[in-house]
From Swiss-Prot:
Highest classification ranks of the organism: Eukaryota, Metazoa, Chordata, Craniata, Vertebrata
Organism: Xenopus laevis (African clawed frog)
Subunit structure: Homotetramer.
Functional description taken from the UniProt entry: Plays an important role in deacetylating mercapturic acids in kidney proximal tubules.
GO cellular component: apical plasma membrane; cytosol
SUPFAM superfamilies to which the protein is assigned, alphabetical: Zn-dependent exopeptidases
Record-listed substrate binding positions: R57, N64, R65, E171, Y281
Binding-site residues, Zn(2+): H15, E18, H108
Keywords: Cell membrane, Cytoplasm, Hydrolase, Membrane, Metal-binding, Zinc
Recorded catalytic activity of this chain's protein: an N-acyl-aromatic L-alpha-amino acid + H2O = an aromatic L-alpha-amino acid + a carboxylate; an N-acetyl-L-cysteine-S-conjugate + H2O = an S-substituted L-cysteine + acetate
Name of the protein: N-acyl-aromatic-L-amino acid amidohydrolase (carboxylate-forming)
Protein topology in the membrane: Peripheral membrane protein
Family membership noted in the UniProt record: Belongs to the AspA/AstE family. Aspartoacylase subfamily.
Length: 305
């Protein structure tokens, strides 16, 4: 059983060039009526306003990697980056972590062909119920729903969504950085409204039965092949491009050199790559993220009296 949800925050602009969340946050700041439900009204947060103004991912560092306990609790300094200062401002408003803030919905876009990806922390059964509700109620073959688990110890949580006791990030793509695609924008709007509907139904006593969830769990991150100078020597193969969440077998091509030579996947087992050729991950030296598909039992969810 879980207590009622009272404080919900919808976040856009955590990355300033991911335009679906930016546009929706700006719209709802002007007219929040769509965020009102019988049992609560969601707050709206434009997380990184300077990055939004400049239409860049971040100013000094990734805001979505700036919510560690160490950064949030450290003494302020003039040398602190803009994003660290902004993370502390958000923490001051909504913190401490996982206390009064019941649910965070953080809105993101990806250049990868990720459809509707729902990121949540492993063990957050409340968020899994919400994800299952979205998969059931928001069926769209153009943007199939996938659940991607963030499987790291709580003390290692650095994402903005970790401010909430429960949370999801909606990662929709493909969409180029700094660009608005109306199909992606409309899809995200539907998903946010359906998420708020779920939370309102829960508050009004709707019980959600147990189920078995299909999830993807991260195995490792794969970098591009690089030379001694650190330069990329081969790129995502055309047969892998846009194949997020599809099985990759040992021997399948993953990279191609400029001379046309293929580099094959030499792992020992089947994997499911995600964030394939994600533009923002070039600086992180990530060509794709390898995941495995798993099934987990999620117990029933009901309101705590």
């Amino acid at each position: 059983m879980s207590p009622p949800v009272s404080q919900v925050v919808v976040v856009g602009g955590t990355h300033g060039n991911e335009m679906s969340g930016v546009c929706l946050a700006k719209h709802w700041l002007q007219d929040p009526s769509e965020l009102r439900r019988k049992s609560f009204t969601a707050d709206i947060l434009l997380a990184n306003p300077i990055a939004v103004e400049r239409c860049v991912r971040y100013i000094d560092r990734d805001l979505n990697r700036s919510f560690s306990h160490e950064l949030l609790s450290a003494s302020a300094s003039e040398s602190d980056s803009y994003e660290v200062k902004r993370a502390r401002e958000i923490y001051q408003k909504y913190g401490p972590k996982q206390s009064s803030l019941n649910f965070v919905i953080d809105l993101h876009n990806t250049t990868s062909n990720m459809g509707t990806t729902i990121l949540l922390f492993k063990g957050d059964n409340f968020a899994l119920h919400l994800a299952n509700y979205l998969k059931t109620k928001c069926v769209d073959p153009s943007f199939p729903c996938h659940i991607l688990l963030i499987d790291i110890p709580e003390q290692g949580h650095v994402h903005l969504q970790s401010m909430g006791k429960h949370s999801i990030s909606l990662e929709l793509g493909p969409q180029p950085q700094g660009v608005v695609r109306t199909d992606v924008l409309a899809r995200m709007k539907v998903l946010v409204n359906s998420s708020l509907d779920f939370l309102d139904l829960f508050n009004q006593g709707t019980e959600f039965p147990s189920f078995e969830a299909e999830v993807h769990q991260v195995l490792h991150k794969a970098d591009f092949p690089r030379g001694a100078d650190g330069e990329i020597q081969a790129f995502i193969h055309s047969e892998l491009q846009d194949k997020d969440y599809l099985p990759l077998k040992p021997g399948d091509p993953i990279f191609q050199r400029l001379n046309g030579d293929d580099i094959l996947y030499n792992g020992e087992k089947l994997i499911y790559p995600v964030f394939i050729n994600e533009s923002a991950y070039y600086e992180k030296k990530v060509a794709f993220i390898a995941t495995e598909k798993k099934h987990c039992f999620v117990p029933a969810l009901k309101l705590q009296n």
